[in-house]
Structures are given as C-alpha cells and as structure tokens.
Amino acid sequence: MFCVQCEQTIRTPAGNGCSYAQGMCGKTAETSDLQDLLVAVLQGLSAWALQARELGIIDSQIDSFAPRAFFSTLTNVNFDSDRIVEYAKDAILLRHSLAVRCRLLDSTITVDHPLAELQLVADDIPSLLQQSQQFALNNDKADVGDDIHGLRMLCLYGLKGAAAYMEHAHVLGQSDEQIYAEYHAYMAWLGTQPRDVDTLLNNAMGIGKMNFNVMAILDQGETQAYGDPQPTSVNVRPVAGKAILISGHDLKDLHMLLEQTQGTGINIYTHGEMLPAHGYPELKRYPHLVGNYGSGWQNQQTEFAKFPGPILMTSNCIIDPNVGNYGDRIWTRSIVGWPGVNHLDGENFAPVIEQALGMAGFPYSELEHLITVGFGRQTLLNAADTVIDLVASKKLRHVFLVGGCDGSRTERSYFTDFARSVPQDCIIMTLACGKYRFNKLDFGTLEGLPRLLDVGQCNDAYAAIMLAVKLSEKLGCTVNDLPLSLVLSWFEQKAIVILLTLLSLGVKNIYTGPTAPGFLTDNLMAILYEKFGMQPITTVEQDMQAILGH
C-alpha cells in the first residue's frame, strides 16, 4: 500500500504516505492496492477512447463510466474491494468492445500506450493484489525523485477531483464532449509515467482549467433542475418525528428521496455538503425537508450514532460505520461503498423509507437555531453593485473567502479563529464543509448585507470565481487587485482540483492549510509560492496583518 492523497496521510521523517495494513482514512491495504490497479486499467481505457476519437468514434458509455469509476478511488468514497474489482472488470469489457468497433474501421489499428492491453490476471483478489504491485504509485519514486513524483500526484489527484465533478454533472444530465476528450487525454498521459517538470506543471494547470468548465456545467445542471439558490434560513435543530438523514453532494438523490417520502410523515435532514440544498427553490418547497443535522464529516461516527433513523450516503465522505454501531442503518448509493452495509443499486428508496417508518425518530422538537444558506452564483452577481458601492464608500474594507474541506486535525481551529477575527467592516464568503467550523456563529450584517455568505458546496467555488470576475470587470482591474483574499482548507482531491482551477485562472496569494499536501515537496511549494504567491497559513494574527496591512 502507498497512498498520499489526503490531508491526514501519515507523515514521517522518512517520507509521507500511508503504507501499512490500513490508511488513516480506514482504507485497507487491499482496497488501496486494488484501486491502484483500477486506475491503471482506466488509464488504458482512456488511451483507447482517445484513439477511437481519431476514427470518429465517441462512446458515451465510456465517457460517463470512466470518471465515475475513477471517482470511486477518492478519499472516503468506496472501501469495498469487490466493488473496485467490478469497476476494473467493467472497464476492460468496455475497452474490448471499443477496440472491436475501432478495428471494424481500421483492422491494423494499435494504441501506443503501455496500459492499452492491460488484462486482469485472474478473478480472485489474492492474484489481483499480486498484480496490483506493478502499479503502486511509488514504484519509481526513488528513480524519478520526490519532485517529479509529487507533480505526478498533483496531476493525478487533481484529475480525480475533476472526475468527481464530471460525475456529479453527468447525474444531472450535463456533459461536454470536449471535457471528456481532455479528461481522457490527461488520464492516458498520466499512465505513461511522465517525467518532464514543465509538462507536469503545465498539465496541472490544464486540469485546473478543464475543471473550471466542469464546474460551469455542474452549476448549469443544478440551477436548471432546481432553480437559482436563494438566501434561506435553515433550522439546525431536530424536529419531532421520524427521520432520514442524507449526506454527500447528490442533489438529484435528495430530490428523489423528497418525492418518495411525501405523505409518509418522515422528515428529511441534510448533512455535510448537502446543506446548500435548502437554498434551491425546487428542493426547499418540500415542507418535510426540515433542516440540517450535525457538523463536519469527521464527526459522523458520533453524530450518526445518535441519529434516530437511517442515513443515506450519496457521495463522499463515509467513514467506518461500525465504530458507532449504525452499520445496519447506513445506506450507500452510486460510487459509495463500505463492506457489509446496504447498497442501493437503483433509484427506489423504499427500503430506506421502510426502515425509517420502523424507527422512533426524534421524540420532541428542540428550540430552533437558524442559519442562512443560498448565496449562490446569481444571488452573488445580483449583489455585485452593492458590494462595489460599499467598497467605494469605504464601508466595506475587504472580502474573505474562508472555506474548503473540514477534517479532524486540531490545527483546523485556525479557520474558526480566523473567521472570528475578521473585522466588522469586512465580510466572509464560505463554501464546502469547512464552513462548519464557524457557520453557526452570528456574524451580523454590514449595511444590510450579511457578513457571512454561504456560497454552497465545494464546486460552488465557481460562483465565487464568477463574482470576482464580475467585480474586476466593473472596477476595471484584475481579480488580484480586488480587496479579496482566499484562505482555504483542504482535505481531499476535490479541494486539490479547485486549487488548481484558481491557480490556472491566475488567482494569486492564496493561503492554504492546515498543512501542505504530503505529496508536495519543499521545492514544489517554493515553485507555487514564486509563481502564484501561494503560501501556507501561519497564525491568525500574522496572516490577518499580512492581508490587511495593519
């Protein structure tokens, strides 16, 4: 096992990365190694998808399957070895079918790629584990050096994040042939074990640019289906009655669950990254979408154990449900998996509903505590003139984007302290689950504008980017000249690709934490600082002083 993709990876003087029987996330060495094998198979599939395009063959099934299967290898998504093997088998079947179609047009066709003809050596996991050792991500690290290896990981993990957003967009009926072509090109290229520093850096930025377009179609899919988010008050305390908790990012799953639970007397609660759903007009119209439950994903083993109903996981993040003894009432969907728990293959949530009806639910309603969400792209753009007027009249000094992933590291209290320290003449935009560090605090208003603006899920960084672009256009300056600072927390691969997106757009002077990614060497961090001014957080006082200048 070798995995260095998340923020909580093991760090030692000898090197970084989880390399024992189990990773810090709970992923076993078996599952980790099989995921490496799956990635290699998917790189070969992408090589064929590229070759097929030269013959005019575009296979929509492969285009949707490839990023979905890749998504299953993200942190805290799928821990089920059997499911990972099934993805690999399906990938090879799809590749074989595509090769047959290509050879009908050109019988001499070959694909010049080291993984183009990769086959699984057997069906049994012990044999596949032995085969997977060929594809361990650190196999040639000693040969190529830490910097090259780190840049490869930056590209690989960034592409994983983009693949996740591609799948979210696909679920909502959004696709783009050019995006799929770029995805396959980057995926196939990574399978060649690239060694050139400049190419690696350029392609990391290319993956970021591609992801900007992915986030655009995802935003389009969400707003076309459910309307533009509107500022909405959300109760974060329990309401008496039977209950289902839904977590993850998949708004379509939430919509289907709301439809199927109408009239049942079951209340639906959002968790984690599902919180922004309350701002969408077509979702918040359901009266039994009663509120949000819990906090950051890392606290789920305690919070889920106390929830008196079933829990539906639609995407990341899932962690071991056996710790809190709720494994019998957690249900996984789509790419999510945990060995031994219930998995829903289709879109019928009847088993979840039946389980909820058989449970007690919350015995009484607690006193309401309301927070506000729904400051999505259109709402932010509509507020652009107000923001400009406040800046011009010197009533608004600075805007901070403080958000990203949450996690269990104690150093993450920095983000709570930072938000608390933002002066009264400044506002905070936030997004992703990092908001749970401070989103239940009362920040008040500034000239009628809430000082805390919840922009949405991690992919809604797109909304913040579009606001920054509009403000810069109206003010006749660059984004980097705006009174805007980004202070981002990272944990997994979606955060990595959002960072690459921001850098690819030329956004500079981003603060990141709580630690540097384990795969980025001091040399690489120095390059990112030199090119983009990207720097690790220090102390709240020091960073605030550097940003505001006094």
Swiss-Prot record:
Compartments, as annotated in UniProt: Cytoplasm
GO molecular function: 2 iron, 2 sulfur cluster binding; hydroxylamine reductase activity; metal ion binding; peroxidase activity
Entries under NCBIfam families matching the protein: hybrid_clust, PRK05290.1
Protein family per UniProt: Belongs to the HCP family.
Main subcellular location of this protein, as a coarse class: cytoplasm
Any one GO BP annotation for this protein: response to hydrogen peroxide
Binding site for [2Fe-2S] cluster: C3, C6, C18, C25
GO cellular component: cytoplasm
Modified residues (Cysteine persulfide): C405
Function: Catalyzes the reduction of hydroxylamine to form NH(3) and H(2)O.
EC code(s) of this entry: 1.7.99.1
Binding, hybrid [4Fe-2O-2S] cluster: H249, E273, C317, C405, C433, C458, E492, K494
Known catalytic reactions: A + NH4(+) + H2O = hydroxylamine + AH2 + H(+)
Pfam family, one: Prismane
Nuclease recorded as keyword: no
Name of the protein described by the UniProt record: Hydroxylamine reductase
Lineage: Bacteria, Pseudomonadati, Pseudomonadota, Gammaproteobacteria, Enterobacterales
UniProt cross-references to InterPro entries, sorted A to Z: HCP/CODH, Hydroxylam_reduct, Prismane-like_a/b-sand, Prismane-like_sf, Prismane_a-bundle
Cofactor(s) needed for function: [2Fe-2S] cluster; hybrid [4Fe-2O-2S] cluster
Cofactor note: Binds 1 [2Fe-2S] cluster.
Domain of life from the UniProt record: Bacteria
Keywords: 2Fe-2S, Cytoplasm, Iron, Iron-sulfur, Metal-binding, Oxidoreductase
